[in-house]
């Protein structure tokens, strides 16, 4: 394979979601690099109607007339030959969702680079943004690494940090990190062969886990601070919720913590007050003031409106269970 000797690189891009799509768009519109192909996940059934839907990255690639590859397995000879025949210099991976085998990475003279939304080695794994919010981190950032055959362990090429605000959700924090990572990716690709000096990651790694819908269930035995962090971390997905009588599921979109010094007279899970400020619930430590909620099939509304929706349970003194 002949390496492209110009500043303009021949790239294979791998990604799936909106975060990935925005990076692909930046590479196409703000650089002279040529995208020879896009690897993305197979179309999947989404929504209540289970309609087969293409990834946002695929939709953009199709619009830009870039060849799209959607392998169900990445270790087949067919997929290998498809990528090999593109004769690309490098593969760039941004929120693809699958592990790229070393066999595929070896195709590219410049190897592969990955954009990760944390300051590695902190929060390796699939949910670094949510993990930073759940942990109450005050600082996070993005890291661009040289890919190897392990997950998020490659040498660091570039990193940039940003402050986490107390009001940040996963979506607002991701938007801030997207700006940093797009800028960083463009910078890294300039004179790629001679412009960076990789740094080996330290051994002080922490790990994030795959998120499931059940993770977003509000457990009143936790502290108000823990619950408020969860509400921000799981926005916009899977959205925190609690259940009434183990049936009615109420989504919680926003909340804040009230420091309360006379908590002993309330039970954990008890609704203390519902007013224009929200619905206040006793937790294991302090009060969680829920401000915006969503009933099944309804629009997001202020928690005070629950009193106007004929919900007999929605009165002070009601004890919400953890089941």
From Swiss-Prot:
Gene3D superfamilies: Formyl transferase, C-terminal domain, Formyl transferase, N-terminal domain. One of its GO terms (cellular component) is cytosol. Keywords: Protein biosynthesis, Transferase. GO terms for molecular function: methionyl-tRNA formyltransferase activity. Its EC number is 2.1.2.9. Pfam families: Formyl_trans_C (PF02911), Formyl_trans_N (PF00551). (6S)-5,6,7,8-tetrahydrofolate binds at residues 118-121. SUPFAM superfamilies: FMT C-terminal domain-like, Formyltransferase. Attaches a formyl group to the free amino group of methionyl-tRNA(fMet). The formyl group appears to play a dual role in the initiator identity of N-formylmethionyl-tRNA by promoting its recognition by IF2 and preventing the misappropriation of this tRNA by the elongation apparatus. Belongs to the Fmt family. HAMAP family: Formyl_trans (MF_00182). This is Methionyl-tRNA formyltransferase.
